[in-house]
Amino acid sequence: DAIDSLKFLRFITAVAARCGQMVNAAEIARDADINQTQAKDWLTILETLGIIFYLHPYSNNLLKRLVKTPKLYFYDTGLVCYLTKWSSAETLECGAMNGAILENYVVAEIRKTYLNCGKEPYLYYYRDKDAREIDIVLEHDGILNPIEIKKTANPGTELVKVFELLDKASTPRAKGAVICMKPGLSAIDRDNYIVPVWII
């Protein structure tokens, strides 16, 4: 009925406002004025319909103190912008959600690229109890590729220091990348690339 439709709109808007964040059903339920069970059920519906997906935390028996909560992303960043009322690219550029929506876009595009090729995307994120985080950990062929996503045109070497956290894992770390607003492909150092967003 109409009341349920309004509740669902509030719900999906609350979900969109949290794209790129760790899932918190209690907060979503509070903002949508529904209970947690309903919020979890509706999240399942969104996932089943291919509207959202989860990025699970990377885990390894040699890495300690890792978080266990997945992060939530939308396949369509245009839907996120519509629901969170960003009317143009110009207003979003200066808005509070620009970093989150850029991250959502990059993660979704990488995932869709794998799926469109008929491959399973082994994508994760890294976050420990000290809030140290790597946006994407790509696992393939027995190696890990760490990726940071930043809304900057001039990424510095400090952005890739966090990649060293993966060196304690049993799976070896390979080349990393910072995906950012720089127009051309280049290197940040001998082990890490600077990749412009438009390439993905």
Question: Model-derived features: where do they sit?
Answer:
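Accessory nucleic acid-recognition modules appended to NTPase machines
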Residues: 1-144
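Conserved beta-strand segments of alpha/beta enzyme cores
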Residues: 122, 175, 191-193
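Short, hydrophobic beta-strand segments that form beta-sheet elements in well-ordered domains
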Residues: 172-180
